[in-house]
Amino acid sequence: MKYNFDTCPNRIGYGSLKWDKYKGRDILPLWVADMDFTSAPEIIEALQQRLDHGVFGYTIPFEEPAEAVINYLDRQHGYFAKAGWLNFLPGLVPAINLCCHAFTEPGESVMTATPVYPPFLSAPDYAHRELIKVPLSLNEADQWTLDIDAMEAAVRPDTKIFVLCSPHNPVGRVFNKEELTAVADFCERHDLILISDEIHCDLIFDEDAKHIVTSTVSKQIADRTVTLMAPSKTYNLPGLACAFSVIENTKLRARFRETIRGIITEVNCFGYAGITAAYNHGETWRQELLTYLRGNYNLVENFIKTELPEITFRPMEATYLAWFDVNKLGLKDPTEYFEKHGVGLTDGTPFDGPQHVRLNFGCPRARLEEGLELIAKAVRARDE
Protein backbone atom coordinates (compact mmCIF):
# COMPACT_ATOMS: atom_id res chain seq x y z
CA MET A 1 0.00 0.00 0.00
CA LYS A 2 1.09 3.55 -0.70
CA TYR A 3 -0.57 4.82 2.49
CA ASN A 4 -0.15 3.62 6.07
CA PHE A 5 -3.30 2.70 8.00
CA ASP A 6 -1.54 0.69 10.69
CA THR A 7 -0.57 3.63 12.89
CA CYS A 8 -2.23 6.76 14.25
CA PRO A 9 -0.80 9.67 16.25
CA ASN A 10 -1.73 10.01 19.91
CA ARG A 11 -5.06 11.85 19.94
CA ILE A 12 -5.38 12.42 23.69
CA GLY A 13 -5.10 16.07 24.69
CA TYR A 14 -6.15 17.49 21.32
CA GLY A 15 -9.78 17.99 22.21
CA SER A 16 -10.78 14.70 20.59
CA LEU A 17 -14.37 13.81 21.45
CA LYS A 18 -13.55 10.17 20.82
CA TRP A 19 -10.44 9.93 22.97
CA ASP A 20 -10.76 12.63 25.62
CA LYS A 21 -14.08 11.16 26.79
CA TYR A 22 -12.00 8.46 28.47
CA LYS A 23 -8.95 10.57 29.31
CA GLY A 24 -7.27 9.19 32.41
CA ARG A 25 -9.26 5.94 32.26
CA ASP A 26 -8.07 2.59 30.97
CA ILE A 27 -10.74 2.34 28.27
CA LEU A 28 -10.08 1.79 24.56
CA PRO A 29 -12.44 4.07 22.59
CA LEU A 30 -14.12 2.33 19.67
CA TRP A 31 -17.24 4.43 19.65
CA VAL A 32 -18.05 7.73 17.87
CA ALA A 33 -17.84 7.82 14.05
CA ASP A 34 -14.44 9.26 13.32
CA MET A 35 -11.51 7.11 12.29
CA ASP A 36 -8.14 6.63 13.91
CA PHE A 37 -6.25 7.27 10.68
CA THR A 38 -4.46 10.40 9.56
CA SER A 39 -6.23 11.97 6.62
CA ALA A 40 -4.92 11.74 3.07
CA PRO A 41 -1.52 13.47 2.63
CA GLU A 42 -2.95 15.33 -0.36
CA ILE A 43 -5.55 16.93 1.94
CA ILE A 44 -2.99 17.74 4.61
CA GLU A 45 -0.80 19.40 1.97
CA ALA A 46 -3.72 21.52 0.74
CA LEU A 47 -4.51 22.61 4.30
CA GLN A 48 -0.86 23.49 4.85
CA GLN A 49 -0.84 25.61 1.70
CA ARG A 50 -3.94 27.44 2.92
CA LEU A 51 -2.32 27.93 6.32
CA ASP A 52 0.84 29.29 4.72
CA HIS A 53 -1.23 31.99 3.02
CA GLY A 54 -1.53 33.53 6.47
CA VAL A 55 -4.81 35.42 6.05
CA PHE A 56 -7.95 33.77 7.38
CA GLY A 57 -10.70 36.23 6.61
CA TYR A 58 -14.38 35.68 6.07
CA THR A 59 -14.88 33.12 3.32
CA ILE A 60 -17.78 32.84 0.91
CA PRO A 61 -18.71 29.91 -1.34
CA PHE A 62 -16.51 30.16 -4.42
CA GLU A 63 -15.95 28.39 -7.70
CA GLU A 64 -13.21 25.90 -6.85
CA PRO A 65 -14.99 23.84 -4.13
CA ALA A 66 -18.24 23.93 -6.10
CA GLU A 67 -16.47 22.56 -9.18
CA ALA A 68 -14.83 19.88 -7.05
CA VAL A 69 -18.22 18.75 -5.72
CA ILE A 70 -19.90 18.79 -9.14
CA ASN A 71 -17.08 16.83 -10.77
CA TYR A 72 -17.03 14.34 -7.90
CA LEU A 73 -20.80 13.71 -8.08
CA ASP A 74 -20.55 13.12 -11.83
CA ARG A 75 -17.39 10.99 -11.73
CA GLN A 76 -18.22 8.94 -8.64
CA HIS A 77 -21.99 8.61 -8.76
CA GLY A 78 -23.13 9.57 -12.24
CA TYR A 79 -25.14 12.44 -10.78
CA PHE A 80 -25.14 15.55 -12.95
CA ALA A 81 -25.68 18.39 -10.48
CA LYS A 82 -25.55 22.12 -11.13
CA ALA A 83 -23.65 24.64 -9.03
CA GLY A 84 -26.87 26.53 -8.30
CA TRP A 85 -28.31 23.48 -6.57
CA LEU A 86 -25.54 23.42 -3.93
CA ASN A 87 -25.56 24.85 -0.43
CA PHE A 88 -22.34 24.57 1.58
CA LEU A 89 -22.97 23.88 5.26
CA PRO A 90 -20.94 23.41 8.46
CA GLY A 91 -22.45 19.96 8.97
CA LEU A 92 -25.30 17.59 8.18
CA VAL A 93 -26.84 17.58 11.67
CA PRO A 94 -27.76 21.28 11.47
CA ALA A 95 -29.02 20.61 7.94
CA ILE A 96 -31.42 17.90 9.15
CA ASN A 97 -32.67 20.22 11.87
CA LEU A 98 -33.08 23.05 9.36
CA CYS A 99 -35.13 20.82 7.08
CA CYS A 100 -37.59 20.12 9.89
CA HIS A 101 -38.09 23.87 10.30
CA ALA A 102 -38.10 24.69 6.59
CA PHE A 103 -40.49 22.06 5.30
CA THR A 104 -42.94 21.47 8.16
CA GLU A 105 -45.11 23.46 10.54
CA PRO A 106 -45.40 22.98 14.33
CA GLY A 107 -47.54 19.96 15.10
CA GLU A 108 -46.85 18.21 11.80
CA SER A 109 -44.95 14.94 11.71
CA VAL A 110 -41.65 13.59 10.39
CA MET A 111 -41.06 9.90 9.65
CA THR A 112 -37.87 7.84 9.70
CA ALA A 113 -36.84 4.18 9.92
CA THR A 114 -35.14 2.90 13.07
CA PRO A 115 -32.64 2.12 14.43
CA VAL A 116 -30.99 5.22 13.02
CA TYR A 117 -28.45 7.99 13.68
CA PRO A 118 -29.79 9.80 16.80
CA PRO A 119 -30.10 13.33 15.28
CA PHE A 120 -32.79 11.90 12.96
CA LEU A 121 -34.80 11.24 16.11
CA SER A 122 -34.07 14.46 17.98
CA ALA A 123 -34.46 16.98 15.14
CA PRO A 124 -38.28 16.78 14.91
CA ASP A 125 -38.60 17.23 18.68
CA TYR A 126 -36.30 20.27 18.66
CA ALA A 127 -38.58 21.81 16.00
CA HIS A 128 -41.74 20.88 17.95
CA ARG A 129 -42.76 18.36 15.32
CA GLU A 130 -43.96 14.83 16.01
CA LEU A 131 -41.69 11.91 15.21
CA ILE A 132 -43.02 8.73 13.58
CA LYS A 133 -40.64 5.79 13.95
CA VAL A 134 -40.98 2.75 11.70
CA PRO A 135 -38.69 -0.21 12.48
CA LEU A 136 -36.48 -1.66 9.77
CA SER A 137 -37.28 -5.26 8.90
CA LEU A 138 -35.16 -8.24 7.83
CA ASN A 139 -35.26 -9.57 4.27
CA GLU A 140 -34.72 -13.14 3.10
CA ALA A 141 -30.95 -12.64 3.11
CA ASP A 142 -31.08 -11.63 6.80
CA GLN A 143 -30.26 -8.04 5.84
CA TRP A 144 -31.98 -4.98 7.20
CA THR A 145 -34.36 -3.30 4.78
CA LEU A 146 -37.06 -0.62 4.75
CA ASP A 147 -40.52 -1.91 5.64
CA ILE A 148 -42.78 -0.14 3.15
CA ASP A 149 -45.93 -1.85 4.46
CA ALA A 150 -45.20 -0.62 7.97
CA MET A 151 -44.49 2.86 6.61
CA GLU A 152 -47.86 2.83 4.82
CA ALA A 153 -49.58 1.86 8.05
CA ALA A 154 -47.85 4.60 10.04
CA VAL A 155 -48.01 7.59 7.66
CA ARG A 156 -50.56 10.29 8.47
CA PRO A 157 -52.11 13.24 6.64
CA ASP A 158 -49.90 15.58 8.68
CA THR A 159 -46.67 13.73 7.77
CA LYS A 160 -44.53 16.00 5.61
CA ILE A 161 -41.00 14.53 5.60
CA PHE A 162 -39.35 11.14 5.37
CA VAL A 163 -35.71 11.12 6.51
CA LEU A 164 -33.58 8.40 4.92
CA CYS A 165 -30.07 7.30 5.88
CA SER A 166 -28.42 5.80 2.78
CA PRO A 167 -26.06 3.98 3.23
CA HIS A 168 -27.58 3.25 6.60
CA ASN A 169 -26.05 4.12 9.96
CA PRO A 170 -25.92 2.00 12.10
CA VAL A 171 -26.83 -1.20 10.21
CA GLY A 172 -24.45 -0.71 7.26
CA ARG A 173 -26.88 -1.44 4.43
CA VAL A 174 -26.49 -0.10 0.90
CA PHE A 175 -30.04 0.10 -0.38
CA ASN A 176 -30.48 -1.15 -3.95
CA LYS A 177 -32.49 0.47 -6.72
CA GLU A 178 -35.59 -1.57 -5.97
CA GLU A 179 -35.57 -0.47 -2.33
CA LEU A 180 -34.93 3.17 -3.19
CA THR A 181 -37.64 3.14 -5.84
CA ALA A 182 -40.08 1.83 -3.24
CA VAL A 183 -39.17 4.70 -0.91
CA ALA A 184 -39.46 7.20 -3.75
CA ASP A 185 -42.90 5.88 -4.71
CA PHE A 186 -44.00 6.03 -1.07
CA CYS A 187 -42.93 9.68 -0.80
CA GLU A 188 -44.70 10.56 -4.03
CA ARG A 189 -47.93 8.79 -2.99
CA HIS A 190 -48.06 10.75 0.25
CA ASP A 191 -46.57 14.03 -1.01
CA LEU A 192 -43.57 13.82 1.32
CA ILE A 193 -40.27 15.65 1.04
CA LEU A 194 -37.40 13.17 1.15
CA ILE A 195 -34.34 14.14 3.17
CA SER A 196 -31.59 11.74 2.07
CA ASP A 197 -28.48 11.68 4.27
CA GLU A 198 -25.83 10.04 2.09
CA ILE A 199 -22.73 10.93 4.10
CA HIS A 200 -21.46 7.32 4.07
CA CYS A 201 -21.86 6.91 0.30
CA ASP A 202 -18.12 6.62 -0.38
CA LEU A 203 -17.48 4.03 2.32
CA ILE A 204 -18.86 0.95 0.56
CA PHE A 205 -16.42 -1.90 1.12
CA ASP A 206 -18.63 -4.65 -0.33
CA GLU A 207 -17.48 -5.00 -3.93
CA ASP A 208 -20.92 -6.21 -5.05
CA ALA A 209 -22.76 -3.17 -3.68
CA LYS A 210 -23.06 0.22 -5.34
CA HIS A 211 -24.39 3.48 -3.96
CA ILE A 212 -27.27 5.05 -5.85
CA VAL A 213 -27.95 8.72 -5.22
CA THR A 214 -31.61 8.64 -4.24
CA SER A 215 -32.60 11.63 -6.34
CA THR A 216 -31.40 9.82 -9.49
CA VAL A 217 -34.05 7.10 -9.14
CA SER A 218 -36.65 9.21 -10.95
CA LYS A 219 -37.30 12.77 -12.06
CA GLN A 220 -40.29 12.85 -9.74
CA ILE A 221 -38.31 12.03 -6.60
CA ALA A 222 -35.52 14.41 -7.62
CA ASP A 223 -38.08 17.20 -7.46
CA ARG A 224 -38.86 16.50 -3.80
CA THR A 225 -35.45 15.44 -2.45
CA VAL A 226 -32.86 17.22 -0.32
CA THR A 227 -29.60 15.28 -0.69
CA LEU A 228 -27.05 15.72 2.11
CA MET A 229 -23.39 14.74 1.69
CA ALA A 230 -19.93 15.51 3.05
CA PRO A 231 -16.37 14.18 2.75
CA SER A 232 -16.01 14.13 6.53
CA LYS A 233 -16.65 10.43 7.21
CA THR A 234 -14.71 9.16 4.20
CA TYR A 235 -11.62 11.32 4.60
CA ASN A 236 -11.75 11.74 8.39
CA LEU A 237 -12.46 15.48 8.28
CA PRO A 238 -15.39 16.11 10.68
CA GLY A 239 -13.40 18.74 12.56
CA LEU A 240 -13.21 20.88 9.39
CA ALA A 241 -17.02 21.28 9.40
CA CYS A 242 -17.75 21.26 5.67
CA ALA A 243 -20.80 19.57 4.14
CA PHE A 244 -23.27 20.37 1.40
CA SER A 245 -26.84 19.89 0.27
CA VAL A 246 -28.09 19.37 -3.26
CA ILE A 247 -31.65 20.61 -3.86
CA GLU A 248 -32.92 20.54 -7.43
CA ASN A 249 -36.39 21.98 -6.78
CA THR A 250 -36.27 25.79 -6.95
CA LYS A 251 -38.98 26.36 -4.34
CA LEU A 252 -37.52 23.88 -1.86
CA ARG A 253 -34.08 25.37 -2.32
CA ALA A 254 -35.43 28.87 -1.68
CA ARG A 255 -37.20 27.75 1.51
CA PHE A 256 -34.07 26.01 2.73
CA ARG A 257 -31.91 29.08 2.09
CA GLU A 258 -34.43 31.37 3.73
CA THR A 259 -34.38 29.21 6.86
CA ILE A 260 -30.57 29.26 6.94
CA ARG A 261 -30.33 33.05 7.10
CA GLY A 262 -28.95 34.31 10.38
CA ILE A 263 -28.74 30.82 11.87
CA ILE A 264 -26.05 28.82 10.07
CA THR A 265 -22.49 30.09 9.88
CA GLU A 266 -20.50 30.05 6.66
CA VAL A 267 -18.05 27.23 6.06
CA ASN A 268 -14.54 28.26 7.12
CA CYS A 269 -11.61 28.58 4.74
CA PHE A 270 -10.04 25.29 5.87
CA GLY A 271 -13.30 23.44 5.28
CA TYR A 272 -13.33 24.62 1.67
CA ALA A 273 -9.68 23.66 1.23
CA GLY A 274 -10.36 20.22 2.67
CA ILE A 275 -13.42 19.41 0.57
CA THR A 276 -11.68 20.59 -2.61
CA ALA A 277 -8.58 18.49 -2.00
CA ALA A 278 -10.58 15.43 -0.94
CA TYR A 279 -12.72 15.34 -4.05
CA ASN A 280 -9.96 16.38 -6.47
CA HIS A 281 -7.02 14.38 -5.13
CA GLY A 282 -8.22 11.85 -2.55
CA GLU A 283 -9.41 8.91 -4.64
CA THR A 284 -6.27 6.75 -4.46
CA TRP A 285 -6.21 7.16 -0.68
CA ARG A 286 -9.93 6.30 -0.50
CA GLN A 287 -9.48 3.10 -2.49
CA GLU A 288 -6.70 1.95 -0.16
CA LEU A 289 -8.84 2.90 2.84
CA LEU A 290 -11.66 0.69 1.53
CA THR A 291 -9.26 -2.22 1.12
CA TYR A 292 -8.13 -1.78 4.71
CA LEU A 293 -11.69 -1.42 6.04
CA ARG A 294 -12.69 -4.56 4.13
CA GLY A 295 -10.00 -6.43 6.00
CA ASN A 296 -11.15 -4.97 9.31
CA TYR A 297 -14.76 -5.90 8.59
CA ASN A 298 -13.75 -9.46 7.78
CA LEU A 299 -11.85 -9.61 11.05
CA VAL A 300 -14.90 -8.43 13.01
CA GLU A 301 -17.25 -10.80 11.21
CA ASN A 302 -15.01 -13.85 11.68
CA PHE A 303 -14.27 -13.02 15.32
CA ILE A 304 -17.94 -12.68 16.22
CA LYS A 305 -18.80 -15.94 14.44
CA THR A 306 -16.03 -17.98 16.04
CA GLU A 307 -15.50 -16.37 19.44
CA LEU A 308 -18.76 -14.60 20.31
CA PRO A 309 -21.78 -16.49 18.97
CA GLU A 310 -23.82 -14.88 21.76
CA ILE A 311 -23.65 -11.60 19.80
CA THR A 312 -25.79 -11.26 16.69
CA PHE A 313 -24.00 -9.45 13.86
CA ARG A 314 -25.78 -9.26 10.53
CA PRO A 315 -24.09 -8.71 7.14
CA MET A 316 -23.20 -5.15 6.25
CA GLU A 317 -21.91 -3.52 3.08
CA ALA A 318 -20.77 -0.04 4.05
CA THR A 319 -19.52 2.29 6.79
CA TYR A 320 -16.95 1.37 9.42
CA LEU A 321 -19.59 0.96 12.13
CA ALA A 322 -20.57 -2.55 13.27
CA TRP A 323 -24.00 -2.94 14.89
CA PHE A 324 -24.09 -5.67 17.54
CA ASP A 325 -27.26 -7.17 19.00
CA VAL A 326 -26.32 -8.13 22.58
CA ASN A 327 -29.76 -9.16 23.83
CA LYS A 328 -28.58 -12.70 24.57
CA LEU A 329 -25.95 -11.42 27.00
CA GLY A 330 -28.59 -10.33 29.52
CA LEU A 331 -26.84 -7.07 30.43
CA LYS A 332 -28.75 -4.30 32.20
CA ASP A 333 -26.59 -1.58 30.60
CA PRO A 334 -24.36 -3.05 27.86
CA THR A 335 -22.33 0.11 27.22
CA GLU A 336 -21.53 0.60 30.88
CA TYR A 337 -20.66 -3.06 31.24
CA PHE A 338 -18.17 -3.02 28.38
CA GLU A 339 -16.62 0.22 29.68
CA LYS A 340 -16.01 -1.49 33.01
CA HIS A 341 -14.13 -4.13 31.06
CA GLY A 342 -11.95 -1.66 29.16
CA VAL A 343 -13.68 -0.94 25.84
CA GLY A 344 -15.82 2.07 24.90
CA LEU A 345 -18.66 1.32 22.48
CA THR A 346 -21.60 3.45 21.36
CA ASP A 347 -24.86 2.84 23.21
CA GLY A 348 -27.63 1.68 20.87
CA THR A 349 -30.47 3.17 22.92
CA PRO A 350 -30.30 6.69 21.39
CA PHE A 351 -30.57 5.00 17.96
CA ASP A 352 -33.83 3.37 19.11
CA GLY A 353 -31.87 0.16 19.43
CA PRO A 354 -31.78 -0.88 23.10
CA GLN A 355 -29.62 -3.90 23.87
CA HIS A 356 -27.39 -3.01 20.93
CA VAL A 357 -23.92 -1.47 20.80
CA ARG A 358 -21.99 0.00 17.88
CA LEU A 359 -18.29 -0.63 17.30
CA ASN A 360 -16.09 1.62 15.16
CA PHE A 361 -13.65 -0.52 13.17
CA GLY A 362 -12.09 2.47 11.39
CA CYS A 363 -8.80 2.06 13.21
CA PRO A 364 -5.44 0.27 12.95
CA ARG A 365 -5.95 -3.49 12.88
CA ALA A 366 -3.91 -4.14 16.00
CA ARG A 367 -6.14 -1.73 17.92
CA LEU A 368 -9.24 -3.45 16.57
CA GLU A 369 -7.88 -6.86 17.58
CA GLU A 370 -7.27 -5.51 21.08
CA GLY A 371 -10.81 -4.17 21.25
CA LEU A 372 -12.35 -7.45 20.12
CA GLU A 373 -10.35 -9.37 22.71
CA LEU A 374 -11.57 -6.97 25.40
CA ILE A 375 -15.16 -7.55 24.29
CA ALA A 376 -14.61 -11.31 24.40
CA LYS A 377 -13.12 -11.13 27.90
CA ALA A 378 -16.08 -9.01 29.02
CA VAL A 379 -18.56 -11.54 27.66
CA ARG A 380 -16.76 -14.43 29.36
CA ALA A 381 -16.60 -12.50 32.64
CA ARG A 382 -20.39 -12.66 32.99
CA ASP A 383 -20.09 -16.18 34.32
CA GLU A 384 -17.33 -15.45 36.81
For each feature predicted by the language model, list its residue ranges.
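N-terminal small-domain helix-loop-helix segment of the aminotransferase-like
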Residues: K2-G91, L98, N280, R382-E384
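Conserved core segment of the aminotransferase class I/II
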Residues: E45, K219, D223-R294, N302, ...
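Conserved core of the PLP fold type I
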Residues: F56-D185, D202-L203, A209-Q220, E373
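Short Gly/Ser/Thr- and Asp/Glu-enriched loop/turn motifs at secondary-structure junctions
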Residues: K82-A83, P315-L321, D352-P354
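Helix C-cap/helix->beta junction micro-motif
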Residues: A127, R189-H190, I221, H341, ...
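PLP-dependent enzyme catalytic core of the Aspartate aminotransferase-like
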Residues: A153, E336-T346, P350-E384
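Conserved glycine-rich beta-strand-loop-beta hairpin in the small C-terminal domain of fold type I
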Residues: T276, Y292-E301, F313-D325
